[in-house]
């Protein structure tokens, strides 16, 4: 037990780090952002898949308007939309053709303004996705930049008459051999085929030429590398502000910025990208106070020092939370903390096929997984607590949902969402509140699948009811954006998948079976995952200890990593969260840990009471918690 006490005291002592500037940080002190971020949950909506109002098979703004009462019922503070702007639709809207106009498939600018007004009437903020780093190759800026004689836009992009090295040549040669090379991410350069120079610099797909924000320490032997203060990069920076201002003037409350850390090239110490975003933040604070900038960065010490209000804990391959959710590399090399088997090594992929033995990590333990994440997360939160917030996501459009593989029952998902929704600032991906599943073998719609990574399975239509297309659209199933929860039929499926199919799976031809994963089937069921989600969000609003600016204090036991236990406190109130995602009962005594916590913080005020519980969980807490027992797949939230 002594090890646990020491861990808590070290975390408490770490609070002094909050006042220290982060590495590469700035002397400017940023406000953390508007008050709604403190107790808020942000709801992410992939607009093509949420609700179709006109029967064409693609979700739209008027469809979202029709479901604002439902979104309000969740208790969320804001909606974040994936890109709504006019797009070439090679990469799900992230190849923008016009930043100033809503794509006609979603409606009009006036429709979006109406949505914003009606959302505001319900106390819900609206945030848009800003693709700041690149455009579509069909964007007028790029087409004019590609002309020999154009002057205004000639340096909005990065052009060269030669490739920088052999590797770039090999990458381009390999990419062009791909029949679908426009959706190939290999390398950084693309053959232009335009009147001017032979090659342009791309960010992701070939259809996404990088905007020119300049290079840090440009190489004089590389004439395409302009400094950040060259006329082209300065003009692009002004365009960025103009786009933000245009939508703020229409009522938008903030932006989530795509690839926020990579706008300036060759910026290893992030000095220039921090300067860029500080300039934007100072301009925004002066002209549009109380608006929010949220980044896809994954490093809050840099992100928040750059002036962002929120950074996101990413579920990417190297993300620290991936070991808790999905394993390090798409369930390829070890165990998963939030699993029935207690973090045993993953031996199969998502299709149920066995992994080769040499790819299975049999050395990493659940304690290793949890300790790694606790160390990372507490450092991120404590060292940036004066600057902004670090958000925890349930899933998103690029990564797996939490309902994946053998983690597929409502009970398991309640435990998972208990973790996410008691963290400092949660972002809830649409459909996760009802347990929608990550699917495989989905069609590659609009660049969703690339390099062996299937993103389409997390973008399937919202499942509203048991009607045609799960209530998403009245269209023919042949015209739907993505299939609605098709039957799970791969060979060698897990037994859990077969059980899931029988109990939860959708039927064929765009219909859903009674009792399936839908809003309709869960709305009035007090024991449903949907209502558990609502209860957790309501609990956040009622208890300041769970707010974004309250402390997160892990209780770690190397010999007994289950149940997961942590404290949230605001100095006035303290809440203990204990979660057991495994198939076995788990017991833990916390008397010495709680005593240490009380001594250091005076954080336990008496009136100990359970606030929420799922599964079979019991405790004995008076002056301390000397007996905490959690049955299989259970969790409890206790006010201390």
What are these model-derived regions, one by one?
Residues 37, 287, 307, 345-349, ...:
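Loop/helix patches that line or flank the sugar-binding groove of alpha-linked glycan CAZymes
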Residues 20-238, 249, 256, 260-309, ...:
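Acidic/aromatic-lined carbohydrate-recognition and catalytic surfaces
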Residues 137-178, 277, 281-461, 466-469:
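Conserved alpha/beta catalytic core and glycan-binding cleft of carbohydrate-active enzymes
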